[in-house]
Amino acid sequence: MFCSRFSVTLQLDKLYSFMGFFGLFSKEKKETLDKGLQKTKESVFGKLARAVAGKSKVDDEVLDNLEEVLITSDVGVETTLKIIERIEQRVAQDKYMNTSELNEILRSEISALLIENNTDDVDDFEAPLKSKPYVIMVVGVNGVGKTTTIGKIAYQFKKAGKKVYLGAADTFRAAAIEQLQIWGDRVGVPVIKQQMGSDPASVAFDTLSSAVSNDADVVIIDTAGRLHNKIGLMNELTKIKNVMKKVVPDAPQEVLLVLDGSTGQNAFEQAKQFTKATEVTSMAVTKLDGTAKGGVVIGISDQFKIPVKYIGLGEGMEDLQVFRRNEFVDSLFGEAK
């Protein structure tokens, strides 16, 4: 038995090493993901175990309890009802279903939802860029970890051998400019900035001009995180986009919305506001390591039909990961299969 387990462990170590060599999912990244989702896993499956206690089959009461578990885990009402409906259809087909099968059914339905809106072919930082410079405009409210996310993305791209420029176009807060400069110094990449109160579009223009002149591979533009005036936000982001196109015609190639996963339903409201203000093409969900609200990743991806590209799992530079749906589900369910 020991030899068998040792052999399996050795083979897994070899597999993770092989995957890590090709920039895929290393053993260390898997361990970070497992640790980051631990609170969510314990919360969801603790509630689920209580919901099915004493039940031998999946009936209406079990499904009602499961619905409550998912909603209180911040999966969201719409997505929860979609999952419950799909499980009901499977129960109707199978006629009799043990509660012991519920974890596996739930796992498969969550996987199916993530497949609909997320590809496992998301480029890692080492992958060739679709254009040069590849311009990412980052949006999100203050306090969600936007600047930290920008810094970590810059670090990962630089580590992968890319030349990175940062643009401090959140000119409404002196602290935002200072924080981005601190990250630029820490990572070792240039930060293009102007004084507080300057025109954000002007900063974006200067950043792209400098990046093109210096043959940069990646440009990341920070923007103001104000939601109190949706029309003003929309106009500002549109102006930044239009000005960037004067330098790089197809910029920005990506509009990344950063959301704080620990805020649960608040993140849904932020996503709603920003998707109305501008075309968001990808999302980063941060601070998942300190919360039991990891279900928000499932709900937001489903409701807004926008892929989650990054997840934040800790304070370390390496703790921002490219989101891979299969590994996410594996870590979420773990031994609860």
Language-model features and meaning:
Residues 24-25, 331-337:
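P-loop NTPase catalytic nucleotide-binding module
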Residues 224-226:
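Short glycine-rich anion-binding loops that position phosphate/pyrophosphate groups of nucleotides
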Residues 9, 13-49:
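N-terminal accessory targeting/assembly segments
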Residues 34, 38-169, 176-196, 204-211, ...:
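Primarily NTPase-proximal linker/entry elements flanking Walker-type ATP/GTP-binding cores
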